[in-house]
Design a protein with these regions (language model features):
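N-terminal low-structure segments adjacent to metalloprotease catalytic domains
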Residues: 1-75, 144, 263-286
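Solvent-exposed, acidic/flexible segments
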Residues: 12, 128, 132, 169, ...
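A structural signal for well-ordered alpha-helical segments within the folded catalytic domains
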Residues: 17-20, 137, 170-174, 226, ...
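Active-site scaffold of zinc-dependent metalloenzymes
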Residues: 55-132, 139-146
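Pan-zinc metallopeptidase signature
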Residues: 186-286
Length: 286
């Protein structure tokens, strides 16, 4: 746990304590392997913006290198458009609205970036349950990334999701949301969700940023968290965490966009594939 800002020793200690509390519960709930090192950083809003823009560009660069050179002009245009959109809202996100973000590195490690100002404005620090939810959520992304072994095929799928509509973020965020609810239930006797906070309890800074037309427009699309949770919850109930974890190493099990809209279809396909694998019957292609 690093405090790159050098200004928040108490918050650093608080996050370290919560990490110690939630780590075994996240491991137990996900049935996934823990990384050998878990990196959490407290950073400034400016550093968050710079790191997030660099992460976005790295995904596009990976996608670009996998495609024919004749597609480069279109991909370059998409990158410029995405970066322009990001920079329009970045000060509102990194400094106010985004409580935490996790990026996969080139090794088997990931890094979670936390902005102290955003934690305060969003109400995360108002109750220990909300900080525990956030840390459990972001830690789950570390385990997801390790489960894929940061393999090129998975990274390619994530990169391509930037330039076309994909389902991978619904899976990742829905899974992490499901886990953070389970972890807070284990810790506090009931699930806790920062999203349930009344807007009247949020800071004026947060409410103003949240009402900004650019943010309202950005949020007019699909809700990664709610739709993702609606996707993952029935799958967990049907096949269990250990079986669901096969999706991290088998891209054929990834939900389609249609299955995100209709989770029962994904659950049925998972059950068929798992049943086929269990009986040793030949697996169909496609």
């Amino acid at each position: 746990m690093l405090d790159d800002t050098k200004r928040h020793p108490e918050l650093r200690a608080q996050v370290e304590t919560v990490l110690e509390q939630v780590t075994p519960l996240v491991r137990e709930t996900t049935r996934l392997e823990l990384p050998s090192v878990v990196n959490f950083r407290l950073i400034t809003p400016e550093q968050w913006q710079a790191d997030s823009a660099a992460d976005l560009s790295s995904h596009v660069q990976r996608f670009r290198t996998r495609k024919p050179r004749w597609q480069a002009p279109v991909i370059n245009l998409i990158e410029r458009v995405n970066l322009a959109k990001f920079h329009q809202v970045a000060p509102l996100l990194g400094g106010v609205l985004v409580m935490g973000a996790t990026a996969a590195g080139p090794s088997d490690q990931s890094t979670t970036m936390l902005v102290p100002e955003a934690l305060r404005y969003s109400g995360v620090l108002s109750r220990p349950e909300y900080l525990a939810q956030l840390i459990a959520h972001e830690l789950t992304h570390h385990l997801q990334n390790l489960a894929t072994r940061h393999r090129e095929v998975w990274a390619d799928e994530k990169a391509s999701a930037i330039v076309r509509s994909g389902s991978i973020k619904f899976l990742e965020e829905g899974h992490a949301y499901w886990v953070d609810q389970e972890v807070t239930r284990l810790l506090f006797g009931a699930a806790h969700d920062i999203g349930d906070l009344s807007k009247s309890t949020l800071s004026d800074v947060y409410r103003k940023a949240d009402a900004d037309p650019r943010i309202v427009k950005m949020r007019s699309g699909p809700d990664l968290y709610k739709e993702g949770l609606a996707l993952v919850s029935p799958a967990m109930e049907a096949v269990g965490a250990a079986n669901l974890n096969r999706v991290w190493t088998d891209l054929a099990l990834l939900p389609t966009r249609r299955e995100v809209k209709h989770p029962v279809l994904w659950v049925a396909r998972l059950e068929r594939r798992l049943s086929t694998a269990a009986t040793g019957a030949p697996r169909s292609v496609g």
